[in-house]
Amino acid sequence: MKKTYKINEIFYSLQGEGYNAGRPAVFVRFSGCNRRCPFCDTRHESGVEMTAEQIRQAVEKADSGQNTMVVLTGGEPTLQLSDEENLFPYTSSRRFIAIETNGTGAVPSWIDWVTVSPKEDVPLDKLPKFNEVKLLFDETRLDYIQLFNRDGIIAFIQPIDRSGKMNIQETVNFIKQNPRFRLSVQIHKLIGIQ
């Protein structure tokens, strides 16, 4: 019996945040998460069981075979992924594979770009190797956020919505005082795309 993955949705859009913002991508949203973050905007419990081949076919269909970047997101994709099965094996038309993870699981070696959005209880030395970190700006997490304020780390700070009010000015002020950080806004939400 072939391994299946619980997939919430697969869609073609633009990456809306971080280092690859604005880049066309097919998003593969995995169901399930080991966190229950109050600010999460993802319905990560529902989904359809799919084999690796079905996922590859859906990705090809989503971008009409244009070979764009693939973003594995969730939920928490590392709960279902491993080195044992490469969802996108090397071929002549190899895609660039990115993952968005909370940093609590092992990232498969076949991933090209790792964006980690750690939660406060994940120590820096316990996170998987990553290319960029995305931190939600919360004044109660300043000590944790400052752990990423060092050379060699691409760190994005993102304002959060609390009771319908974004903390944009506080986020901007923090970045101006800590210039190693970069601002990340959810472009896809600003321009009204998925």
Where are these regions (language model features)?
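Short N-terminal micro-motifs specific to bacterial/archaeal maturation
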Residues: 1, 24, 46, 134-136, ...
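A secondary-structure boundary/capping signal
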Residues: 29, 73-74, 186
